[in-house]
UniProtKB/Swiss-Prot annotation:
CDD domains: ps-ssRNAv_Nodaviridae_RdRp. Belongs to the nodaviridae RNA polymerase family. This is RNA-directed RNA polymerase. Its cofactor is Mn(2+). It comes from Boolarra virus (BoV). Keywords: Host membrane, Host mitochondrion, Host mitochondrion outer membrane, Membrane, Nucleotidyltransferase, RNA-directed RNA polymerase, Transferase, Transmembrane, Transmembrane helix. Disulfide bonds: none annotated. The viral bipartite genome is composed of RNA1 and RNA2. GO terms for molecular function: RNA-directed RNA polymerase activity. GO terms for cellular component: host cell mitochondrial outer membrane; membrane. For RdRP activity. It catalyses: RNA(n) + a ribonucleoside 5'-triphosphate = RNA(n+1) + diphosphate.
Length: 998
């Protein structure tokens, strides 16, 4: 086929035409590419890379055509909840530790909110157990296994106080994932990071932690100016092989990251939160200069190149001033001055001129001016090497979830580090939120209005009749006899003040306060009756009733208050022997708060009304009305609250009445188990009782809980296990069938043995030795406890005051065991040492090898602050915010009620204690029950204060209140063995008659 050309007769073929078109198009394309490529070599309107135009165009073209954006949305400060985090306990570095914990929580939450996963570098066990890079460099790293995982596609790489030890940042950045760091990046050359001192020597930070370790490391310049950094990009082996031809041409793949930093922690301005966001990856020639400007991360050089021996660091302040921190290498002294002033001073010709200019600028502090002059002259000094004693740790603090406290506020002290990490906590008794929460948890939430059935009420009446026995015409003690029996120092002081008005009707009011003692949950409340006249009035009857009835022969087998330690151990061993070891431990949950008004009326009140002569009944009913329905207020803070009908812990009736309620529950269980038995025979089967502690026969293990519920009470039952011993009155009987040896409950004791609540003005050595001396009297052979006490005595002994000075203090016995103040001690036989160790191992969960190592550690210690703490696998702390956050179970449906009560009781503008006594009714008061108040005149709510000795927060004065805080002294019961009387009846049959009928 031919094509005719209009401009001539020449003809061409189609093939020739298509070939021509291809040639023309190719030439055009080449021309276009050349023009575009040549365009990459254009001269920019700002500085450009060196080299010729061809290489410059080649580099620009490769970067432009290979750039790959990486889209990541991440802003961690959206998860910032507080800038002043606080810890519940002071471990020597509470503030810096709280900031680290808060940073960890912030990082975790911010990652979770964007759906990412966490990949952490050398985390602690409480942080993560997931994918991580974990090498063993520090002792703490051994808590987790060695791992070298790779970050996932959605991973955020996290480092908390570890980036200093990285050899090069590219090992973290090459994954092209966000990097989040909590790091130390100081703005001054020495000083304190919150509560931990640091210095800088040879460009290395020397950071020493009170209650922790010492660290030496350089610092990366994350916070330097320049927002973009470059890194290599990690490739798999397969990708690396595919890219090998490109690498042979001199190409490399790099990534660009945007770097951010902030300093959100008010108390730790030298701590920074650093995070990088990957932006792009590109290919580029290594042999051609790049025009993309980034900064290179490097170690910070603190040394001043113009002043050898000095460090210098500049930073911009919050009000946009350029400041300079200067100080000698390795020294703690540093000063901060405006840079323009320092530059001006550096140009002066004489030191006198420097001083004159500083004074003229308003700097008159000799310390400040001297430091500037020394820097001006470049004066160097030889560093002294001396040991440093760092601040001791403070007790672990119970921190209610509703508390508004900023810092822990406790007066208790530690004299060694805790023996076990899950130690007891001290309540913040100066905080009104602590009082409010204790009221809710120990009074309001457990209030009991349950009325038993007719059958159970009949059993209770039967118990009262058996308990009273033949006594129907008792006489109360005289006032003189009662005053003689009230021998506590605080009571004697009050009695002398009111002796002339002894016949006046006492005031009806309760002033409560938190007991300053360590515990694992909300602190106990002491509901005290401040009017000593009321104590005298009640004690006339309670003491007479205890002497005549409760210590009578027919009650001595179960009523244990008033017995000596030897009498208690003999009675317990006899009871366990009678039962052939088939016994159970009973322990009521919050018996004081859960006792109902019905129980108090129909057991305790009924017993006394029937035992005393008729003319005393009105007075008995009167003081029982007061105990059950008396109005109450917080002694320290002044707010009123509804105290409920429970037992009031500051009343003389507390221990004897609680013991009666305890025995009544067991008697009810015996009636359930043996419904056809003789009442007198069942009564003789009651086990030892003292307050809410008790022992009972194992035959009623299934019925005693049912009996407790009939009265609205909660009871915990444990069957005696020879491997863990038998616990009664916080003493563990190691083998009651064969030996009377007892030991302190080891776990409970080890949790609090390192704490003293003595007045802080008393030297710590005196307080420590006074405390451990008591344990060495009662537990001289108890493993761990005795060795620990001897260690404290050995190391603190040379530092104590003289024996006369220590004995002269009124609080000398404040922390002595109750039994020691009563001239009694628990029996311990040295030959039972192996058995005692086995019980300690079983009850604490600490294996025998660890116990032996710890005992050896105590013997070898040279300093009381050496680390001895054993890590607990789990915490038993409750109703608190602990070191790692809110303790499990502390936030539940009760939180709203706690907050409501807190708001109701709060005072406008303050949460601290009142400076004045309680005033008249205010809008802050809670409604009070008035239907069942005792009859008679009521005084105004504006009550006069009692004697100052009763209310001073002074350990020496308050000691009298705690010297006999346990079981009241009384008449020691006597009598012969009761084995035959206690023989258990056969099931379904009537028990045999006792051999010694009463």
């Amino acid at each position: 086929m031919t094509i005719k050309i209009i401009l001539g007769e020449h003809q061409i073929t189609r093939t020739e035409l298509l070939g021509g078109i291809v040639i023309v198009s190719g030439c055009g394309a080449v021309a276009y590419c050349i023009s575009k490529f040549w365009g990459y070599g254009a001269i920019a309107p700002y500085p450009q890379s060196g080299g010729n135009r061809v290489t410059r165009a080649l580099q620009r073209a490769v970067i432009d055509k290979t750039k790959t954006p990486i889209k990541t949305h991440f802003y961690p400060l959206d998860s910032l909840r507080t800038v002043t985090p606080r810890r519940a306990s002071d471990n020597g570095h509470a503030v810096s530790g709280a900031v680290r914990d808060a940073a960890r929580r912030l990082i975790n939450e911010s990652i979770e909110t964007v759906g990412g996963s966490k990949f952490e570098l050398n985390p602690n066990p409480n942080s993560t157990m997931g994918p991580r890079n974990h090498f063993h460099f520090a002792v703490g790293d051994l808590a987790q296994n060695f791992r070298d995982d790779q970050p996932a596609a959605d991973a955020f790489i996290v480092g908390v106080d570890v980036d200093y030890y990285i050899t090069e940042p590219d090992v973290l950045l090459e994954h092209m994932r966000p990097l989040v760091l909590h790091t130390f990046n100081p703005k001054k050359v020495s000083g304190f990071d919150a509560d931990s001192p640091f210095t800088i020597n040879n460009n290395l930070v020397e950071y020493k932690v009170s209650g922790g370790a010492a660290w030496v490391h350089p610092v990366w310049d994350w916070c330097e100016a320049g927002e973009f950094i470059a890194s290599r990009v990690r490739s798999s082996w397969f990708e690396w092989l595919l890219q090998l031809p490109l690498r042979c041409l001199g190409l490399e793949r790099v990534g660009y990251h945007k770097i951010h930093h902030c300093r959100p922690w008010t108390d730790c301005p030298d701590r920074a939160l650093v995070y990088t966001i990957p932006q792009h990856t590109v290919w580029r020639f290594t042999w051609i200069d790049t025009e993309i400007h980034t900064r290179k991360l490097k170690r910070i050089t603190y040394q001043d190149n113009t002043k050898p021996g000095w460090n210098r660091l500049e930073h911009v302040s919050d009000n946009n001033q350029l400041l300079v921190s200067i100080g000698r290498e390795g020294e703690h002294m540093q000063i901060t001055i405006e840079k323009d002033k320092l530059e001006m001073l550096s140009g002066l010709g004489a030191t006198q001129s420097v001083n004159a200019r500083l004074i003229g600028m308003g700097h008159k502090d000799p310390l400040y001016t001297s430091m500037i002059v020394q820097y001006y002259t470049g004066k160097k000094v030889v560093l002294s090497v001396a040991p440093t004693v760092y601040r001791p740790t403070m007790p672990r603090v119970h921190w209610p979830v509703t508390s508004d406290a900023d810092v822990p506020e406790v007066s208790a002290r530690q004299y060694t580090k805790p023996i076990i990490s899950d130690c007891m906590m001290m309540p913040m008794i100066k905080r009104w939120e602590t009082m409010s929460e204790s009221i809710e948890r120990r009074v309001t939430f457990v209030a009991n209005n349950k009325k038993p059935s007719d059958a159970v009420a009949k059993i209770a009446a039967e118990f009262v009749s058996l308990m009273n026995g033949p006594f129907i015409d008792l006489e109360p003690l005289t006032i003189e006899e009662t005053v003689e029996r009230l021998n506590k120092p605080s009571q004697q002081l009050q009695l002398r003040a009111v002796f002339e008005i002894m016949g006046v009707e006492p005031r009806q009011v309760i002033e409560s306060f938190n007991k300053n003692e360590p515990g694992m949950k909300s602190s106990r409340i002491i509901s005290a009756f401040p009017d000593i006249l009321f104590i005298v009035k009640v004690s006339r009857y309670t003491l007479a009733y205890s002497d005549a009835v409760l210590h009578a022969e027919h009650n001595q087998h179960w009523y244990y208050p008033g017995r000596t330690p030897v009498g208690i151990t003999d009675g317990v061993c006899e009871f366990v022997s009678d039962c052939d070891g088939q016994v159970i431990e009973t322990d009521f949950s919050n018996l004081d708060g859960r006792v109902s008004g019905w129980m108090q009326r129909n057991i305790a009140q009924k017993a006394m009304v029937q035992a005393f002569r008729a003319e005393y009944r009105d007075e008995i009913i009167s003081f029982m009305d007061t105990i059950i329905n008396c109005p109450a207020k917080a002694k320290r803070f002044g707010f009123r609250y509804e105290p409920g009908m429970g037992v009031k812990s500051g009343s003389p009736t507390t221990t004897p009445h609680n013991t009666q309620y305890n025995a009544c529950v067991e008697y009810t269980a015996l009636k359930f188990e043996y419904p056809d038995a003789n009442p007198e025979d069942l009564f003789s089967l009651l086990g030892p009782k003292c307050g809410d502690d008790g022992l009972a026969r194992a035959t009623i293990q299934k019925t005693i809980n049912r009996a407790a519920k009939c009265y609205g009470l909660e009871l915990k039952v444990e069957k005696y296990n020879p491997e863990v011993g038998l616990c009664f009155l916080s003493r563990v009987f190691v083998d009651p069938l064969n030996t009377p040896t007892t030991i302190q409950d080891p776990l409970r004791t080890l949790r609090k043995l390192h704490i003293t609540t003595r007045d802080p003005t008393i030297p710590i050595a005196d307080a420590a030795c006074d405390r451990v001396e008591g344990y060495l009297c009662t537990d001289a052979h108890t493993p761990l406890i005795s060795e620990y006490c001897r260690m404290v005595q050995r190391l603190y002994g040379p530092k104590t005051s003289t024996r006369d000075v220590r004995e002269a203090r009124r609080s000398r016995n404040k922390e002595k065991p109750y039994w020691l103040t009563c001239d009694g001690s628990w029996p311990q036989h040295p030959q039972d040492a192996l058995l005692m160790k086995q019980i300690v191992v079983s009850r604490t969960g600490i294996d025998e090898d660890t116990v032996d190592k710890l005992i050896g550690r105590f013997a070898a210690m040279k300093d009381v602050w050496e680390p001895i703490t054993l890590e607990s696998e789990e915490s038993k702390a409750a109703q608190t915010i602990d070191e790692e956050g809110v303790a499990p179970g502390s936030v539940d449906e009760s939180l709203l009620k706690l907050n409501d009560a807190k708001q109701t009781r709060s005072n406008s503008g303050t949460s601290g204690p009142h400076t004045k006594g309680g005033g008249s009714g205010t809008g802050n008061e809670l409604p009070r029950s008035t239907k069942q108040r005792a009859k008679g005149p009521r005084q105004s709510a504006g009550l006069p204060k009692q004697g100052k000795a009763n209310s001073k927060p002074n350990g020496n004065v308050a000691a009298g209140q705690a010297q006999h805080g346990g079981i009241p002294r009384g008449k020691t019961p006597s009598g012969g063995k009761t084995n035959a009387r206690r023989a258990p009846p056969k099931a379904g049959a009537q028990p045999g008659a006792p051999t010694n009928p009463k």
